[in-house]
UniProtKB/Swiss-Prot annotation:
Source lineage: Eukaryota, Metazoa, Chordata, Craniata, Vertebrata
InterPro entries linked: Frizzled/SFRP, Frizzled/Smoothened_7TM, GPCR_2-like_7TM
GO (cellular component) term, any one: apical plasma membrane
Entry's family note: Belongs to the G-protein coupled receptor Fz/Smo family.
UniProt free text on domains: The FZ domain is involved in binding with Wnt ligands.
Record's protein name: Frizzled-3
Gene: FZD3
Residues that span the membrane, as ranges: 6-26, 55-75
Amino acid sequence: YPERPIIFYAVCYMMVSLIFFIGFLLEDRVACNASSPAQYKASTVTQGSHNKACTMLFMVLYFFTMAGSVWWVILR
């Protein structure tokens, strides 16, 4: 019983970590807002809709986070 849900759960969180790694590698190219040292605003990776790459990363991150949560509930 628990083998498949554990594998699916692990795959979901592997995708979550991959999205964070991609965001780290691409830096400001996938940021949703530009960093502004004068206003002390940091770049975000998962908010906004002006940048298509930002929106795609958010959607994939959200999907796999929710899917992982569902698999966690199935395991319990």
